[in-house]
């Protein structure tokens, strides 16, 4: 199981609430070109409907007047997810600035949002290629 801990540090989407468009949604659309609803593992009574290796994305987000909220997205580790991992890997390797940062904490700047990745295992490690 590959786990990604994604912690939001800034969010400016013009949404009524950050829950309307969490980071996992933006990242999935950015790298996979698809909406998470097409690849996510839906559960019935807490039991995954799909079997196999799972990629879990943990998000944490807040607004001025809201307490911190957490949400977990689970994705089947299929070709689309593998494509995401490879693309992230390529991006990491090609970024000179990123190589000076600790492996456990990587910042990725998108037009919106800005986020901090905390990867338990590290996407750039060879065993995930």
Residue spans of the language-model regions?
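Domain-length accessory/inserted modules outside core catalytic folds
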Residues: 1-129
């Amino acid at each position: 199981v590959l786990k990604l801990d994604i912690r939001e540090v800034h969010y400016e989407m013009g949404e009524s609430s950050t829950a309307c468009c969490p980071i996992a949604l933006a990242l999935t659309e950015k790298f996979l070109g698809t909406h998470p609803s097409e690849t996510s593992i839906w559960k019935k009574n807490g039991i995954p409907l799909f079997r196999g290796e799972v990629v879990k994305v943990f998000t944490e987000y807040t607004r001025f007047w809201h307490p911190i909220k957490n949400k977990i997205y689970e994705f089947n580790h299929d070709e689309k997810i593998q494509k995401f991992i490879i693309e992230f890997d390529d991006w990491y390797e090609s970024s000179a600035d990123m190589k000076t940062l600790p492996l456990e904490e990587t910042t990725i700047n998108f037009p919106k949002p800005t986020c901090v990745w905390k990867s338990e295992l590290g996407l750039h490690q060879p065993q995930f290629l």
